[in-house]
Amino acid sequence: MTSIVVAALYKFVTLDDYVALREPLLQTLLDNGVKGTLLLAEEGINGTVSGSREGIDALFAWLRSDPRLADIEHKESYCDEQPFYRTKVKLKKEIVTLGVLGVDPNKQVGQYVEAKDWNALISDPEVLLIDTRNDYEVAIGTFEGAVDPKTRSFREFPEYIKAHYDPARHKKVAMFCTGGIRCEKASSYMLGAGFEEVFHLRGGILKYLEEVPQEQSLWRGDCFVFDNRVTVRHDLSEGEYDQCHACRNPVSLEDRQSEHYVPGISCPHCWDSLSEKTRAGARERQKQIELARQRNQPHPLGRDPRQSTLEN
């Protein structure tokens, strides 16, 4: 029986005192044995955490005791082992970094579409369907008919839209992302750029995979997640992908059969672009990671690459 609850959460809400919230929030996480990373900014809160059932419930009881977060929603999945090494609360300018001044989901967002209604919307031939995630995420799974912007970070999304789409020609735009936060902010940007009918998937891909029966699904592949599970399948069970610590790309079972795959050091996506200095550093890093795992200790060398994309 799985014992670890993984909770993905976010809410766009004005938090003028977000700096002062950091310490009590961090203490709540630590007191309840909850691990993972939460981001705080004036525009809201975002992150993924994991812990026992009691620990996660205690965290959300604390969050919802603040009237501004009383209706915060989250998505849960489950795993057998703790997927995060550390507990962090970071202060940021944005809880998901778009880098465009004036974009404020607290003031305007597109139309939310529930998971049960998503298939009907994206089956409309007049709807432009855009995957707002990074290129390596799209490569392992996306919705049927979705456009891949091939962006490496969310900061590249505005320029992609400017270069490829015109509000006068593209009347209906639907967007999606892992948990809903990126496409919600993207919808605010799109409205500000003049697009009139903008839709986004409430709860993101994770909510869709949770609620829509697989036989009715228009999702193809796995969904990348920002923890040590790497990917999840349609029933939110852990997928078969691993992740290369050197380049952060997901690696499939086939990739792991390659002569260029060395756990923690290189994979078919990056083996020919790494310097010997980088390889040497990766070897030492992997050695320390394995030692830490054997001792059941936190990752000893800073940021876990599986969490680093949370902000991008």
From Swiss-Prot:
GO terms classed as biological process: tRNA modification
Enzymatic class: oxidoreductase
Positions annotated as active site in the UniProt record: C177
InterPro entries associated with the record: Rhodanese-like_dom, Rhodanese-like_dom_sf, TrhO, TRHO_N
Molecular function via GO: oxidoreductase activity, acting on paired donors, with incorporation or reduction of molecular oxygen
Limits of the Rhodanese domain: 123-217
Enzyme Commission number(s) from the entry: 1.14.-.-
Record's keyword terms, sorted: Oxidoreductase, tRNA processing
Catalytic reactions of this protein: uridine(34) in tRNA + AH2 + O2 = 5-hydroxyuridine(34) in tRNA + A + H2O
Compositional bias (Basic and acidic residues): 282-293
Region (Disordered): 282-312
NCBIfam families, A to Z: PRK00142.1-4 (NF001136)
Function (record text): Catalyzes oxygen-dependent 5-hydroxyuridine (ho5U) modification at position 34 in tRNAs.
Protein family according to the UniProt entry: Belongs to the TrhO family.
Protein name: tRNA uridine(34) hydroxylase
Annotated source species: Pseudomonas aeruginosa (strain UCBPP-PA14)
Gene: trhO
